[in-house]
């Protein structure tokens, strides 16, 4: 018996019952069984499954069973992702909301537990336990409480987010929900400071994006080529970037920036300026935290350009603040190294150039920026003119003016302004240290151009904002990175610049303000300077020489141009043609590639659609099959459940069923359950009777003894209680009387005291009434006037309102009347359409019935034809068997007989030739021709099957069911064809058997040597004489003559087939030449019968040959069609035949034309007659 499974609504009720009795695990198992059962997946709608799913997820959250919730969510997604996406979204949001609420409650509970612990003992705050715990684990009470109470719920919530993201990552209908859950997960990491989970979440989202990009060609799923998908992914990555910056996870922020840049590059739509501004701002922040001042300044410059170009309502203060930020960030870039290729020997993974190129791509720059290029761009954008005077001076002092003695003092004033400025200026404070380092480097470079040596003390006075150690470090860095010739003499506390005049490693290119070159640079470029000066002097001494040289050179150039201008012109034209051809070739290739890509995408789309359609059809069929099975199973379960419920209505039935589990109940039938119920009832009755008897005795003795002992005790207790009650009543009554007397005395005294105030009260009331009477009258008049005006106003409003109501009522009645008429017209049209549809349906049913009757009639005809075919086939088989049996009997009778060949034959007369040609055919030939008849009958059946197939094709236009009749008749023709083949194989087997028998039993003569053969005496012409009648090949001649005589005496037989007579060895007068007759025996001394013969099957024409059909169908034609043509190969007249005609050529009664048989008149019907067979 199949396992019993509950319906979803019953499972929900049972789960609620388990929850009420405190068994949530059993309730969860009950609901889980429903989702594990494949029967209910497609049998119910979301209105039935959704409440059950909410209860299922509620239990999973309560029990912290995230893996069970995942199983249910995936099953629910498979059920309703293509049917009702809103239901799936509601379920997932409800699940996450429940998990978040439980996590927040756990956090509040953890905080409350810590507060209770902290306020437990105010006198002893630091308990020994808390001291020991803090020393062992280094955690406070809050951390321990969170680990115990909050951390399990945090883990459950994190798993829930991951499950939902995995659930929705490839669902194109839930993209918005997927990205909402991703943002909720970011908020979760921010709220609970989960950095490791945040990294895993970023990796998970990045992996999902890679999967989407890989499967972008598929039509089923999320496609990154859609604009909506790209925008959602971009917004999610921007939110991820904000969250990473808030959590100070700069590596994840950089990866998010790479993802954002990739999405913006992938999108065909230009990102909005607000998004680009946010992108550049976050990118500048990441570069700043990474310590890359160069790209930080480049990002701020891009942000400044974007804001200045696209923001129309930008105020002057905002523009000034942004310009100051960009200028200070650019000036704070450290001075570049003179030989950056040295870093290649230190870096292990990638060269700095590759890293810089990769970062430049994020900023949309063609090549990595440099400090010089950024300052040049800042000047081009007129940034120094937009900032305040102080920052403009800062730019001039660092990049334009050469004043090393006052440089640090000037920069210090700017630093003080930044440090003491307003709040918005404090945003520039991170650039102070970088600005100081750049200033010190500028100071060292400018000092090296002015002084050859300087003391440390003096240099420290000039560098006001650094100590000796920082200054020495900067000097070493300048030597290492900037190729400055600096030597520090600690003994004399002095510094020497450019002392080695023989060393100059590179060409000096001044960066910033410069006064003069270094001595080593001057020595290195002395020859260059000398050459320049000498060239200038020569041009002054010989002013015309250069002019003559230029004229001569010009003449040569013109001459050379005239020589090659044609060739160059042709080359240019040819190059232009090559370029055009190349463009056309590239364009053709691009067009072909686009067409191929479009064709491929179209083909993939078509295949995907076909696959999806096929999948949907298979799913529909599977759902229908499962629904049908579910209905059958539900009926069985319902009947069993009704029986169980009928038994469980009684108390003893419930008790009996409680002892059995569900599996045990399923294994029982109704009779077994009724038997157990009766047994349980009998057993309970016996137990109850025995208990009642035992308790009767016990209660009787016990109650009697107890009451006898209670009587004196009850009497004593009642007496004491009466005395105590009387005393209590008397004391209570005395107290009540005393309280009543005291209350009356107090009330009387109060009344007497208040009587003196009555005159004063009356006087006051009279005076107050007189004072306010006039005011009351005036207000009353005003009120009456206002009341009258309001009454008139309301009356007028009521008149207007009633008029409007009547108008609206009239319009509503008109509209209702119009709608009623339209409804009547619509109903009449619908009735007419239904009547027309019903008429069409009846007409179709009549046509179907007519077609069905035709099909039944045709089927009856086909069955009759098959029956006739079978009867004819059996008749032919019987005839072959009878003839074979008769030939076996005749073999023993005609073989011993024989005779000499007629002398006329020996004389070579024509009559003799005709006589021996018409001798009886051998048995093997008759059997073989019988097989040929069967085969020809099979071929006729095959042609009949073809005709029936064509008839079936014609009937196919009338309906598909008629086609099966043609197929059956086609199979009938094939069966008859196989029957003919079997008959042919039978004839072949008989012939082989007779050929393999001995010489005495065979009509053929074995080939023997001439000496053993006993050939006849040759005549004078040298040809062998015909053998005597005693030879083996003439045995049976008398039998043939007797048979021929019998044939003549039979008279005409109209129902006999001529071919059957010929096949059985008979001959006819005036038979004419036969197509299969052999030529006359040649005078070669041999026996023509001994020569090997070809099989008749080898001589036959194909079944479709017209001549073959004419020969085989000769019985249906007249004598004219069977008469031999004149001048045939074996005519009975003419000298060549050796004589005139004989008695065999005379017409006999058997040669009379057979009467024509009636042919079927109905050409549309198919039937087979015995003649056709």
Curated annotation (Swiss-Prot):
- Basic and acidic residues compositional bias, start-end: 836-900, 925-1011, 1028-1081, 1090-1125, 1149-1165
Q: Where can this protein be found?
A: Cytoplasm
Gene Ontology biological process terms from the UniProt entry:
formation of cytoplasmic translation initiation complex; regulation of translational initiation; translation reinitiation
Q: Name one GO molecular function term.
A: mRNA binding
Sorted alphabetically, which keywords does the UniProt record give? Cytoplasm, Initiation factor, Protein biosynthesis, RNA-binding
Single GO cellular component annotation?
eukaryotic translation initiation factor 3 complex, eIF3m
From the UniProt entry, list the residue stretches annotated as the region Disordered.
Answer: 589-613, 836-1173
- Protein family membership: Belongs to the eIF-3 subunit A family.
Q: How does it assemble?
A: Component of the eukaryotic translation initiation factor 3 (eIF-3) complex. The eIF-3 complex interacts with pix.
Q: What is this protein called?
A: Eukaryotic translation initiation factor 3 subunit A
Q: What organism is the protein native to?
A: Drosophila persimilis
Q: What is the lineage of its organism?
A: Eukaryota, Metazoa, Ecdysozoa, Arthropoda, Hexapoda
- The gene that this protein is the product of is eIF3a
């Amino acid at each position: 018996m199949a396992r019993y499974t509950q319906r979803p609504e019953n499972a929900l009720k049972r789960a609620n019952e388990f929850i009420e009795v405190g068994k949530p695990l059993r309730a969860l198992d009950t609901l889980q069984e429903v989702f594990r059962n494949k029967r209910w997946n497609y049998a119910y709608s979301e209105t039935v499954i959704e409440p059950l799913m909410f209860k299922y997820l509620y239990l999973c959250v309560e029990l912290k069973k995230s893996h069970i919730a995942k199983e249910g969510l995936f099953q629910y997604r498979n059920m309703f992702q293509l049917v009702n996406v809103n239901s799936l979204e509601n379920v997932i949001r409800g699940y996450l909301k429940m998990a978040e609420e439980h996590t927040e409650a756990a956090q509040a509970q953890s905080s409350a537990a810590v507060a209770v612990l902290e306020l437990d003992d105010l006198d002893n705050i630091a308990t020994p336990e808390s001291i020991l715990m803090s020393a062992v684990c280094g955690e406070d009470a809050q951390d321990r409480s969170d680990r115990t109470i909050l951390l399990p719920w945090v883990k459950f919530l994190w798993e829930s987010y991951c499950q939902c993201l995995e659930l929705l990552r490839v669902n194109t209908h839930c993209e918005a929900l997927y990205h909402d859950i991703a943002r909720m997960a970011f908020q979760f990491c921010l709220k609970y400071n989960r950095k490791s989970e945040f990294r895993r979440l970023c990796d998970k989202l990045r992996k999902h994006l890679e999967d989407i990009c890989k499967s972008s060609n598929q039509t089923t799923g999320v496609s990154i080529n859609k604009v909506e998908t790209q925008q959602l992914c971009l917004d999610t990555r921007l939110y991820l970037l904000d969250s990473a910056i808030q959590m100070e996870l700069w590596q994840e922020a950089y990866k998010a920036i790479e993802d954002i840049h990739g999405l913006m590059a992938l999108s065909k739509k230009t990102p909005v300026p607000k998004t680009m501004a946010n992108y550049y701002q976050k990118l500048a922040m990441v570069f700043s935290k990474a310590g890359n001042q160069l790209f930080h300044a480049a990002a701020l410059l891009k942000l400044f350009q974007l804001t200045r170009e696209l923001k129309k309502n930008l105020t002057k203060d905002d523009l000034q603040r942004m310009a100051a930020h960009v200028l200070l960030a650019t000036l704070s870039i450290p001075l570049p190294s003179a030989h950056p290729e040295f870093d290649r020997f230190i870096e292990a993974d990638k060269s700095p150039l590759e890293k810089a190129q990769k970062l430049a791509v994020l900023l949309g720059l063609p090549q990595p920026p440099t400090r010089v290029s950024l300052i040049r761009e800042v000047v081009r954008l007129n940034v120094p003119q937009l900032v305040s005077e102080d920052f403009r001076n800062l730019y001039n002092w660092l990049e334009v003016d050469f004043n090393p003695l006052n440089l640090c003092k000037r920069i210090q004033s700017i630093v003080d302004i930044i440090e003491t400025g307003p709040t918005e200026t404090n945003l520039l404070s991170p650039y102070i240290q970088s600005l100081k380092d750049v200033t010190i480097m500028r100071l060292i470079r400018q000092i090296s151009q002015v002084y050859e040596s300087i003391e440390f003390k003096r240099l420290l006075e000039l560098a006001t904002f650094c100590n000796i150690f920082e200054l020495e470090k900067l000097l070493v860095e300048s030597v290492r990175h900037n190729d400055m010739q600096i030597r520090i003499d600690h003994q004399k506390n002095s510094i020497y610049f450019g002392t080695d005049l023989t060393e100059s490693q590179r060409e000096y290119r001044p960066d910033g303000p410069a006064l003069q070159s270094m001595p080593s640079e001057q020595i290195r470029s002395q020859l260059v300077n000398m050459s320049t000066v000498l060239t200038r002097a020569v041009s002054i001494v010989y002013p015309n020489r250069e002019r003559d040289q230029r004229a001569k050179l010009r003449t040569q150039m013109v001459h050379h141009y005239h020589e090659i201008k044609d060739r160059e012109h042709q080359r240019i034209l040819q190059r232009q043609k090559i370029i055009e051809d190349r463009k056309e070739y590239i364009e053709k290739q691009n067009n072909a590639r686009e067409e191929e890509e479009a064709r491929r995408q179209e083909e993939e789309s078509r295949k995907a659609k076909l696959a999806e359609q096929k999948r949907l059809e298979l799913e529909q069929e599977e759902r229908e099959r499962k629904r049908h099975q579910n209905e059958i199973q539900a009926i069985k379960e319902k009947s069993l459940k009704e029986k169980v419920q009928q038994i469980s209505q009684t108390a003893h039935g419930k008790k009996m069923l409680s002892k059995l589990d569900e599996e045990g109940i399923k294994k029982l039938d109704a009779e077994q359950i009724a038997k157990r119920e009766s047994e349980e009832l009998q057993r309970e009755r016996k137990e109850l009777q025995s208990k009642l008897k035992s308790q009767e005795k016990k209660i009787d003795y016990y109650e009697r003894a107890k009451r006898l002992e209670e009587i004196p005790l009850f009497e004593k207790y009642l007496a004491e209680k009466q005395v105590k009650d009387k005393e209590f009543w008397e004391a209570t009554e005395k107290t009540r009387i005393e309280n009543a007397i005291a209350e009356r005395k107090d009330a009387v005294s109060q009344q007497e005291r208040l009587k003196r105030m009555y005159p004063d009260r009356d006087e006051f009331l009279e005076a107050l009434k007189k004072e306010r009477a006039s005011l009351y009258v005036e207000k009353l008049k005003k009120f009456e006037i206002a009341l009258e005006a309001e009454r008139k106003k309301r009356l007028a409003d009521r008149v207007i309102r009633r008029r409007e109501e009547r108008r609206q009522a009239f319009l509503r009645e008109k509209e209702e009347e119009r709608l009623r008429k339209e409804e009547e017209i619509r109903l009449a049209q619908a009735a007419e359409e239904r009547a027309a549809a019903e008429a069409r349906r009846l007409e179709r049913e009549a046509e179907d019935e007519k077609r069905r009757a035709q099909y039944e009639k045709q089927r009856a005809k086909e069955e009759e034809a098959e029956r006739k075919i079978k009867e004819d086939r059996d008749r032919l088989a019987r005839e072959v068997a009878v003839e074979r049996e008769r030939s076996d009997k005749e073999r023993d009778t005609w073989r011993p007989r024989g005779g000499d060949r007629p002398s006329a034959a020996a004389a070579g007369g024509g009559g003799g030739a005709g006589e021996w040609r018409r001798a009886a055919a051998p048995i093997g030939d008759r059997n073989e021709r019988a097989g040929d008849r069967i085969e020809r009958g099979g071929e006729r059946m095959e042609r009949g099957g073809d005709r029936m197939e064509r008839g079936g094709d014609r009937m196919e236009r009338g309906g598909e069911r008629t086609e099966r009749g043609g197929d059956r008749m086609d199979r009938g023709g094939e069966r008859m064809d196989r029957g003919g083949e079997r008959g042919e194989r039978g004839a072949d087997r008989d012939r082989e058997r007779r050929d393999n028998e001995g010489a005495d039993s065979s009509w053929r003569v074995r080939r023997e040597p001439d000496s053993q053969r006993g050939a006849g005496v040759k005549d004078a012409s040298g040809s062998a004489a015909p053998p005597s009648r005693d030879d083996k090949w003439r045995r049976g001649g008398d039998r043939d003559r007797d048979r021929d005589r019998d044939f003549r005496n039979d008279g005409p037989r109209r129902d006999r087939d001529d071919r059957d007579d010929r096949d059985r060895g008979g001959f006819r007068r005036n038979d004419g030449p036969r197509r299969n007759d052999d030529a006359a025996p040649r005078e070669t001394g041999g026996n023509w019968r001994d020569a090997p013969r070809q099989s008749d099957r080898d001589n036959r024409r194909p079944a479709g040959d017209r001549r073959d059909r004419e020969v085989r169908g000769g019985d249906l034609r007249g004598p004219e069609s069977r008469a031999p043509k004149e001048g045939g190969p074996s005519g009975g007249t003419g000298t060549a035949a050796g004589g005139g005609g004989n008695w065999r050529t005379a017409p006999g009664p058997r040669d009379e034309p057979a009467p024509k048989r009636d042919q079927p008149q109905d050409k549309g019907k198919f039937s087979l007659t015995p003649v056709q067979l």
